[in-house]
Design a protein with these regions (language model features):
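Residue-level signature of mid-helix packing/kink "hotspots" within the transmembrane helices
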Residues: 58-66, 148-149, 259-267, 351-352
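A late C-terminal transmembrane helix in Major Facilitator Superfamily
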Residues: 335-363
Length: 392
């Protein structure tokens, strides 16, 4: 979608909220590659608990995405967004103070409870006209995906200067700036019908019935789960491989080129999304992801890890952008927040399950973890086996 198709007001809003959510995502993801290794320095740590510390963020994100989505449908997006971001800030401060693995798990859980991504997607979708939504959501999804991916490279550079503990403080400052930017610069025009309206259980039940009765919507939820399961599993493994090849401080040598190439790939893909090839691109992306993971079997080769990371990152960023875009395309306006809450919940359940499974199997079956991720990626192809985009 060319930016010239947006009005000045729409473009300013879109850029502001995309950058704000992108910075929030970057700050939250920056420490992710170091959680599995940092956990070893904490009291009572085990590989399984390290996996839980990495993945619990995704679990609480999953639990709270739907309530936050429903809440935003009733009282508006801005207040819910600000409330959720403040939860993240408190969680980061607790992580900074954590001396044992259990307190870190608690902190990560609290960070995840600020489940605002669905709210952000709903706000963007409701702020532009119908014909502009695919382009707007592609821009939002790409910025968030790129921010999350590039944070892995940025994180390794920052870690050369700061300890993981102090990185939590840096992330706190970044996210507080996001909170201020949303508070001061973004205004929401809420329909009067939603101001102060109580949450009606019948309306919520009807919304769930319509959404979950749509086969494509259900498959998109499964696609989101699979994509995030693989992503979180891969980012449990790669830092441990690279710790022996480049050291954690050298991870940028892998992630920086991977992110740059993935961004170029995503820019090319957007034009095909606008032409209606979203589902076919999902299939191709899962195939590329599976091939990329296959390169990780040669875990001692810098170049194999690099090629695998590039292919994986291309697949991940494309899927992260397309899946919510298609979901918003088929969801009705009146329960868009609920729809985004559901699909983001499935994504974050995947973010929780991926590292927990990887952590539980890691000490004895490293190759089995890779095989599981490849099989799951190939199963992801089945989620796009339909040509119908019936609205729900």
């Amino acid at each position: 979608m060319n930016s010239k198709n947006f009005s000045r007001k729409e473009l300013l809003f879109l850029i502001t909220i995309s950058i704000a959510l992108g910075i929030r995502q970057m700050a939250m993801t920056m420490v992710m590659p170091f959680i599995s290794t940092y956990s070893k320095t904490l009291i009572h740590s085990t590989p399984t608990l390290a996996g839980v510390a990495l993945g619990i963020f995704g679990l609480t994100q999953a639990i709270f995405q739907i309530p936050f989505g429903i809440w935003s449908d009733r009282i508006g997006n801005k207040f819910v967004l600000l409330f959720g971001i403040m939860e993240v800030i408190v969680g980061l401060i607790i992580a900074y103070l954590a001396a044992n693995i259990y307190l870190l798990i608690l902190a990560r859980a609290l960070q995840g409870s600020g489940a605002i991504l669905a709210v952000g997607y709903s706000w963007v979708t409701g702020s532009v006209s119908t014909e502009k939504r695919p382009g707007a959501l592609s821009i939002l999804g790409m910025i968030i995906g790129v921010a999350a991916a590039s944070s892995f490279a940025l994180g390794s550079i920052v870690n050369n200067l700061l300890s993981v503990r102090n990185m939590f403080l840096v992330c706190t400052a970044l996210i507080f700036m996001v909170w201020l930017a949303i508070l001061l610069f973004l205004k929401e025009e809420k329909p009067s019908a939603f101001k102060g309206e109580a949450i009606n259980k019948t309306d919520v039940r009807d919304s769930f019935k319509k959404l979950l009765g749509n086969k494509l919507f259900v498959r998109l939820n499964l696609a989101g789960f699979i994509n995030n399961f693989i992503m979180a599993g891969v980012f449990f493994m790669i830092p441990q491989y690279l710790d022996k090849i480049t050291g954690l401080s050298g991870m940028w040598k892998i992630f920086m080129p991977a992110v740059i190439i993935a961004v170029v790939c995503m820019r090319k893909v957007i034009s095909f999304v606008e032409k209606g090839y979203s589902l076919k691109i999902i299939v191709i992306s899962y195939i590329v992801t599976a091939i990329g993971i296959g390169f990780f079997f040669n875990k001692t080769s810098f170049y194999f890890i690099l090629i695998g990371a590039i292919l994986f990152m291309c697949g991940y960023i494309v899927l992260s952008t397309i899946i919510p875009s298609v979901a918003n395309e088929i969801a009705e306006d009146s329960y868009r927040g609920t729809a985004n809450g559901i699909i983001n919940s499935f994504q974050y359940i995947g973010s929780f399950a991926g590292p927990v499974v990887a952590g539980a199997l890691w000490s004895k079956h490293e190759s089995l973890v890779l095989l599981i991720l490849i099989v799951i990626a190939l199963l992801g192809i089945l989620t796009a086996k339909t040509n119908k985009k019936q609205r729900c």
